Every structure is written in structure tokens, then in C-alpha cells.
Amino acid sequence: MGRFAQGKFTVKNPAKYIGNKVPTYRSSWEFTFMKFCDEHTSVSQWASEAVQIPYRNPITGKHTIYVPDFFIAYGDKNGKQRVELIEVKPLNQTVQEKVGKNKHNQVHWVINQAKWEAARAWCKQKGIFFRIVTEGDLFHNGRRR
């Protein structure tokens, strides 16, 4: 089994980082997204694992908490200020057809759907957006964006 890149991210632009704790990346993709948030001029604020959203786990039936990977505020290409919650996931965990017949993967897909439905509802109440970022968003032609 492969190991994921994990560690503490060193923020270069502390005025932009609004989280209460040192950002921790749990994959190289999260590291890439942190670097993007920290360095991109359009991103005005960002935080790692800063929001807690209650949801019901559809497998256990228990109420629990979902913590999306990122909160970001940025100016879009039209100059409009946007605020989003971001979850970084591999594409094969976001599309049911790509999950396959593996029971473990199917359970995670069902749980993720419940988390993301709760996140969309929470964001709608706050007037912000929820987005899932995959490798297609992070990388272009096999290179980091």
C-alpha cells in the first residue's frame, strides 16, 4: 500500500491565511492546492479544515461532522468576489460509475455523497459555493497548474 504525502504547510503569505491552526496537508494534491491558495494573487483569504458541517452518516445512521478541506475567498476573472468551500478528491471517488464494485469504495462513495449534500445545503444557506476539486482541476497535461 502506498503512502500519502502528509505534513504541515508553511504559509508564505500569512495575511491571507485565516485558519486557526497550522494547515496540514494529507495528500500531495492538498499540498498543491495549499500552495495555489497561498501564492495566487486572486486568492484573498483561505483556511484549511476551518468549517464543521453536521450530517447524518447514511451507513451508521449517526449524526457526525464533515470538515471540508478548504475555505477560500477569491476574485474571479470578472473581478467578482467569490467564497467557496473546497473538497480535494480523486475523480474516481466522485463519480459513481468510476467507484466500481468494490464494497469498501461503494461505502465511501455513499458517505461522501451525504457529506457533500450537507455541504451544499450549508453553503446555500450562507450564500457561498461548494466545489469538489479533482486531479483534472489541479493538473494540466500531467503537470501541476
PLM region spans:
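Electrostatic, structured charged patches in enzyme active sites and in nucleic-acid/phosphate-binding
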Residues: 1-145
